[in-house]
Structure formats: structure tokens, C-alpha cells
From Swiss-Prot:
It is an enzyme of class 3 (hydrolase). Residues 109-525 form the PPM-type phosphatase domain. Heterodimer of a catalytic (PDP1) and a regulatory (PDPR) subunit. The modification N6-acetyllysine is found at K202. This is [Pyruvate dehydrogenase [acetyl-transferring]]-phosphatase 1, mitochondrial. Belongs to the PP2C family. Magnesium-dependent and calcium-stimulated. PDP1 activity strongly depends on its Ca(2+)-dependent binding to the lipoyl domain of E2 subunit of component of the pyruvate dehydrogenase complex. Its EC number is 3.1.3.43. The keyword Nucleotidyltransferase does not apply. The gene is PDP1. PANTHER family: [PYRUVATE DEHYDROGENASE [ACETYL-TRANSFERRING]]-PHOSPHATASE 1, MITOCHONDRIAL, PROTEIN PHOSPHATASE 2C. It comes from Pongo abelii. It is found in: Mitochondrion.
Length: 537
């Protein structure tokens, strides 16, 4: 019988298994990755299940093995230098400024900053940003993967095309289809703004294009040709649902190419949440599926900052989501559909792309697995059926869409995966970004917690805080600045280099126990243009 790592790898990395099932396991280079006793429940995308209580645990010489690998959790007195810290924090940062025409920016967006800090290896988060070329507006989104990065990668590549096609008028769709039929060059519909590390899958591009083409052909057939206004909310919902349907269909049909066949199955059996913003002038739409968030930074008349939430988490803390799930399934499942704050006791987000194990019937799952490649058929995770699985689907990718009309006081938008929101309160996020963008920082009073502090000690604390503040504003990217605070903040609300160094020095097998992947996009709005829209009305 193959070793547990051979059964699970590479569909899901073994480090991921220890998080999913809360068991100790070997990673592919024979190291003891992690143990459930050290992993906070909030860090688990899936909760442990008894069926796997012994599956991943080494059966022999367990005590001697853990002693021999003690180095993995032994604290080491090693600190990164400030340049080394900056190198890590800035490795994935990206900035885009909207170009000016005749010395003026006529867009409601000045530009955006984005960045990522991995905790998983490889990182499971993705990000995307693109300008719509055949319609107006800009699309920006963050995608949080689980059970691997296959689904988040696919969604980050494909979703914006589905949205752009959904927004196109009938005449443009016909023009694109005629160009494909005649072999002419296609009209570009998106201009991507990507970091060099943000890649596209060349091997799957033809498959993805064919699915997208089928979608716009159906839109052409459904449209009578009459000129009608496009409903952005409806377009976003249709795009999300259609992409998820295509992900499911591609996995069911398979592909003659063995690599693509395995790829589409990996995409379907893993999962991803998505939070996407579409900005067109003063019209801001946010489509959210899962537990990433969109937060608007509002500057009040007195100069202070307030946070306006533009998305809702789709998890057990959302009463409306709990009610929705209970209404969609028989009363006999009222106590089992959500257990321990997880869908069927396993999955934390209640909406997501992929995750076909929570959408397909049991018969369909068995048929696809049995006819699939050996890696899939021999994989215990894919063959595992969730408990109390009676009336699928239990999971949907349909987004909740929020509309907001921008005002001059709306200065920026923060899109971020839950790795940020788990470490920082929304008000702190908005305050830190607002102070960074304006260059004004309001110091918080130093709290000494009831201890007696001499004047000299207080002077030392103030001097230390001033020194740290001077180094923080070296960031040229608002998302980097926010990540620096999320990882390195101390009790005074300032960045502690020692703490930041320790957090960034954690080995791969330990980093995920302390934090999640963090992906952030900060969109800065053009208050002058937004104000001009308001004056015209």
C-alpha cells in the first residue's frame, strides 16, 4: 500500500492535509509538518474528521521521530535585518497609476497598489486587475484558495473574461464571434495589470477559450438584438455562476490530454472564494462569494477615518447565510447542514467556486473518480464523501452584489482575503491606509497596563515609537504598508521590527499555524472627478 503522502500528493499538498484533518503527517520531503495541537481552529479551512484520525499519522517510532525533528518547532535567535524584511515584504508588490490625457486624469480611479504575503507554500491566494476595453470601468479582485491553489488560479485567470463578456452589448458579441469564424484578430476586451509572478496557464488557454466562446454564443442567442441597458449586478451574478458551472462541466467531461484532464479535476475538487469590484465612474459594484472582504475608506469632515463595509462574510457568523442554508434543505438536516460553524462540519465558507464534493451527487462523484486518472482514483480525499450528505448541492458560487455610489469623501477601497481581517480590525485597516495616503499619522496614547513607569522609561518608549514610525513610511505601496502592520504591529499600534522579523523568519511548516496567506488591493479614488460627477447632477 502506498504511503499516505503518495495517496494525497500532488492533488493536495501534505502540509494542507495537516490543516484539513488536524493530524500530523509527513510532507513530501519526509519532514514532520505540523500537529493539530498547535493549529488554531480559526486557521483550519476544513475541520478534522474521525475517518482520518489515524490515516496520516506515522505508526512506528512516533516519539523518536518527533524528537529527531524537534528543530522544526525550536525557537531560534535569528532576526532578519530591515533590508531583508523589506525584500520579503516587497517581493510581490505591484502598483498601477491610471494614465493622464492632456495632463488630466478623467478616471474616478487614480490607481491601485497590491501585494501578497504567503503563509502556504505555494501561496493559495491569487489577485487580478484589468481595465475593460470594450466597455467602461475597471475590475479588481482577490481570490482565496483552499485544498490547494488550482481553483483560485483558474478563477483569477477566467472570471474577469466572463464578467467582461456579460457586460458587452449584443453588437460587440456578434463582432467577436464573426472574427472567430473568419479567423480574424479578436477585439481585445481586457487590459491586464499583473505582477510578473502572476501567471496564466498556457496549457489550458484553448480549453478556457472554448468554454468562454460557448458562453458568449449563448448570450447572442438569448439576445433579440434590441438595444437594452446592461444590468451590472445581473452581469456579475451570471458571470460567477457560469464560470463555476463550466469548472464543474469540464471536470465531468474530461479531456483527451492527460495533463489537462488532471488539471480540470484538480480545479474542480479544490475551491476558492472571490471578492471582485467593478468601478465605472462613480458606480461601484462589489461581488463577493465567501469570506474575503471589501472595505471603503471614508474621510469625515474632521479628518478622521471611518470604515464602510461593502461585503458580507458567507460563513457561520452570518445569520442570513445560516437561514438560507436551512431553507434550501429539508428540516431533517437542520442540525447537520452546519456543524461546528462549518458546512457539513467541514468547510468554513458557505459559498465558493469549485469544491464539487459539496455540489455533485454521490453517484456523479464516484463515476468521475472511477473514470479519472490514477492519481484521482487512488486519492483518499477525493473518494471521501462528507457526512450527512443527502441533498446536494450544499455549496454555491453565486455572489452577493453590493452597489455604492461614490462620494468625494470616499477616498479608497481595500479588497483583501481573510488573512488580513483575521489579524486586524476593519477600522484599524482604514485608519492605517488613510494616514499612509495622506501622510498624517495620529499617534495612539501609550498604554502601560497599570505598571509603574518612570519618566526615563516613558521617554524611552516614546523615542522607540518615533524611530519605528520613521521607518514605516518608507513604503511606496499602500498594500505593503498594510501587510507590515498586519504582521508586525505591537500593543502600541506601531510596527515592531523584532516581531516582524520573527514572523517572517518562520519556516514554511510553522508559518501557517500563526497566520494565513494575505492578499491586498488598495484602490485610490480621484475625489476631483467624483466631485465633478456629483456637481453635474
Amino acid at each position: 500500500m502506498p504511503a499516505p503522502t503518495q495517496l494525497f500528493f500532488p492533488l493536495i499538498r501534505n502540509c494542507e492535509l495537516s490543516r484539513i484533518y488536524g493530524t500530523a503527517c509527513y510532507c513530501h520531503h519526509k519532514h514532520l509538518c505540523c500537529s493539530s495541537s498547535y493549529i488554531p481552529q480559526s486557521r483550519l479551512r476544513y475541520t478534522p474528521h474521525p475517518a482520518y484520525a489515524t490515516f496520516c499519522r506515522p505508526k512506528e517510532n512516533w516519539w523518536h521521530y518527533t524528537q529527531g525533528r524537534r528543530y522544526a518547532s525550536t525557537p531560534q535567535k535569528f532576526y532578519l535585518t530591515p533590508p531583508q524584511v523589506n525584500s520579503i515584504l516587497k517581493a510581490n508588490e505591484y502598483s498601477f497609476k491610471v494614465p493622464e490625457f492632456d495632463g488630466k486624469n478623467v478616471s474616478s480611479i487614480l490607481g491601485f497598489d497590491s501585494n501578497q504575503l504567503p503563509a502556504n507554500a505555494p501561496i493559495e491566494d491569487r489577485r487580478s486587475a484589468a481595465t475593460c476595453l470594450q466597455t467602461r470601468g475597471m475590475l479588481l479582485g482577490v481570490f482565496d484558495g483552499h485544498a490547494g491553489c488550482a481553483c483560485s488560479q483558474a478563477v483569477s485567470e477566467r472570471l474577469f473574461y466572463y464578467i467582461a463578456v456579460s457586460l458587452l452589448p449584443h453588437e460587440t458579441l456578434l463582432e467577436i464571434e464573426n472574427a472567430v469564424e473568419s479567423g480574424r484578430a479578436l477585439l481585445p476586451i481586457l487590459q491586464w495589470h499583473k505582477h510578473p509572478n502572476d501567471y496564466f496557464s498556457k496549457e489550458a488557454s484553448k480549453l478556457y477559450f472554448n468554454s468562454l466562446r460557448t458562453y458568449w454564443q449563448e448570450l447572442i442567442d438569448l439576445n433579440t438584438g434590441e438595444s437594452t441597458d446592461i444590468d451590472v449586478k445581473e452581469a456579475l451574478i451570471n458571470a460567477f455562476k457560469r464560470l463555476d458551472n463550466d469548472i464543474s462541466l469540464e471536470a465531468q467531461v474530461g479531456d483527451p490530454n492527460s495533463f489537462l484532464n488532471y488539471l480540470v479535476l484538480r480545479v474542480a475538487f479544490s475551491g476558492a472564494t472571490a471578492c471582485v469590484a467593478h468601478v465605472d465612474g462613480v458606480d461601484l459594484h462589489v461581488a463577493n462569494t465567501g469570506d474575503s472582504r471589501a472595505m471603503l475608506g471614508v474621510q469625515e469632515e474632521d479628518g478622521s477615518w471611518s470604515a464602510l463595509t461593502l461585503s458580507n462574510d458567507h460563513n457561520a457568523q452570518n445569520e442570513r447565510e445560516l437561514e438560507r442554508l436551512k431553507l434550501e434543505h429539508p428540516k431533517s438536516e437542520a442540525k447537520s447542514v452546519v456543524k461546528q460553524d462549518r458546512l457539513l462540519g467541514l468547510l468554513m465558507p458557505f459559498r465558493a467556486f469549485g469544491d464539487v464534493k459539496f455540489k455533485w451527487s454521490i453517484d456523479l462523484q464516484k463515476r468521475v473518480i472511477e473514470s479519472g486518472p490514477d492519481q484521482l482514483n487512488d486519492n483518499e480525499y477525493t473518494k471521501f464523501i462528507p457526512p450527512n450528505y443527502h441533498t446536494p448541492p450544499y455549496l454555491t458560487a453565486e455572489p452577493e452584489v453590493t452597489y455604492h455610489r461614490l462620494r468625494p469623501q470616499d477616498k479608497f477601497l481595500v479588497l483583501a482575503t481573510d488573512g488580513l481581517w483575521e489579524t486586524m480590525h476593519r477600522q484599524d485597516v482604514v485608519r492605517i491606509v488613510g494616514e499612509y495616503l495622506t501622510g498624517m499619522h495620529h499617534q495612539q496614547p501609550i498604554a502601560v497596563g497599570g505598571y509603574k513607569v518612570t519618566l526615563g522609561q516613558m521617554h524611552g518608549l516614546l523615542t522607540e515609537r518615533r524611530t519605528k514610525m520613521s521607518s514605516v513610511f518608507e513604503d511606496q505601496n499602500a498594500a505593503t504598508h498594510l501587510i507590515r502592520h498586519a504582521v508586525g504591529n505591537n500593543e502600541f499600534g506601531t510596527v515592531d521590527h523584532e516581531r516582524l522579523s520573527k514572523m517572517l523568519s518562520l519556516p514554511e511548516e510553522l508559518a501557517r499555524m500563526y497566520r494565513d496567506d494575505i492578499t491586498i488591493i488598495v484602490v485610490q479614488f480621484n475625489s476631483h472627478v467624483v466631485g465633478a460627477y456629483q456637481n453635474q447632477e
